[in-house]
From Swiss-Prot:
The gene is atpA. It is an enzyme of class 7 (translocase). Produces ATP from ADP in the presence of a proton gradient across the membrane. The alpha chain is a regulatory subunit. It catalyses: ATP + H2O + 4 H(+)(in) = ADP + phosphate + 5 H(+)(out). CDD domains: ATP-synt_F1_alpha_C, ATP-synt_F1_alpha_N, F1-ATPase_alpha_CD. The keyword Ion transport applies. It is found in: Cell inner membrane. Pfam families: ATP-synt_ab (PF00006), ATP-synt_ab_C (PF00306), ATP-synt_ab_N (PF02874). F-type ATPases have 2 components, CF(1) - the catalytic core - and CF(0) - the membrane proton channel. CF(1) has five subunits: alpha(3), beta(3), gamma(1), delta(1), epsilon(1). CF(0) has four main subunits: a(1), b(1), b'(1) and c(9-12). Keywords: ATP synthesis, ATP-binding, Cell inner membrane, Cell membrane, CF(1), Hydrogen ion transport, Ion transport, Membrane, Nucleotide-binding, Translocase, Transport. This is ATP synthase subunit alpha. The record marks 371 as: Required for activity. NCBIfam families: atpA, PRK13343.1.
Amino acid sequence: MEIRAAEISAILKEQIANFGTEAESAEVGQVLSVGDGIARVYGLDNVQAGEMVEFANGVKGMALNLESDNVGIVIFGEDRGIKEGDVVKRTQTIVDVPVGKGLLGRVVDGLGNPIDGKGDLVDVERKRAEVKAPGIIPRKSVHEPVQTGIKAIDSLIPIGRGQRELIIGDRQTGKTAVILDTILNQKAVNDKAKDDSEKLFCVYVAVGQKRSTVAQVVKVLADHGALDYTIVVAATASEPAPLQFLAPYTGCTMGEFFRDNGMHAVIFYDDLTKQAVAYRQMSLLLRRPPGREAFPGDVFYLHSRLLERAAKLNDDNGAGSLTALPVIETQANDVSAYIPTNVISITDGQIFLETDLFFKGIRPAVNVGLSVSRVGSSAQIKAMKQVAGSIKLELAQYREMAAFAQFASDLDPATQKLLARGARLTELLKQAQYSPLAVEEQVCVIYAGTRGYLDKLKTTDVVRYEASLLGALRTSGADLLESIRTGKALSKEIEQKLVKFLDDFGKKFA
């Protein structure tokens, strides 16, 4: 075979002409030390605070401490595969996560990667995990209700769309149960909705919980058909502290997608105590100076910048909303500890759950005296306002009298009546788990309580009376429920119908 010099030179010229000159440039650094989920890196001179970096083995990290001679990086994963001298690359992107409707029904980790084995995410875009909260001008005051389906909350501590309402209590007082009931209660509304702007989407963020607990929550949601409108973000106890720190921001960004596109979402952070503990661990390992209870000085800002992102937007901005229900776990009912007081001061009210009430069988164990909703009353529907107005006062008087009555032997009839009414109302506010009630059913039940229909009954019969009443309402009183649902207020005509219905029912009930 003859080799022609001209041909060789032609081939070489062609290859040189097509040679890509764009060399890949990546700013790199070297690991100085690594341990406890923190890496100290030399180099990376132009790295930004909060920027995602990549280690040689593919594990990602986030630059948090930018010091004169090194960079402190928290590692989103196992630090075992990283060693001294390894190369670290800048990605030149601030930490971002997937958002969109493709996440509904999925379980993802703190970075938004799916962990439910259902394959890759589809129909998603990417947004930064940390963004500024909306300012004052785009907002509107809270005026639409979020129905939890729990009588004690919807009547006494109403929650509005765009509100931040704290759920606070010791371990095992039913905090997650309140969240689950709220999610399940949206099913009826969402099934009837004509379009997405009428639905209420849910985002559940589990921080530092056992995997078995998260699996149980997902199973309950799936069994009740509630996963279709829910996103679960799970950073469990076995995951590194940086992922537990990031998970609430990840979930919030996912919820903001609905808020910014004229839809409504509610996000549950379960719980922020564990996020603060994870942040404390990271901060101490990064050698940031500790403050009260060894938390870093900016732990207030950690929670305030997260919760300020919940908002009700005005009509010019799409009228969407993001409601936040953070959870805080207290130790021995100590609401005056550092993190609880911080979060109470950031939120628009709190639902206080008590161990004593829980063990007395009052479940949900809501302490009506200490719980408050600072903006929710303007979101409550008129019918509920009309029937529940007196219940708070009557329960407060009952608690005051009950303490006093323990010492007094003979009580006048008025006091006895007050105590009897209070005991029946307390009984009426009890509710089984996973059985949320529609607001029109709550209105009828509470009307029966506040207008004296329970006074003739034994306290032990109240629960049975309520169950029978609800059964009767759903069968023979369906038109009455429909008129309350559509009218959203008790007109004279509807009230007369309700009184007649309760009178007739009272005669049959025995």
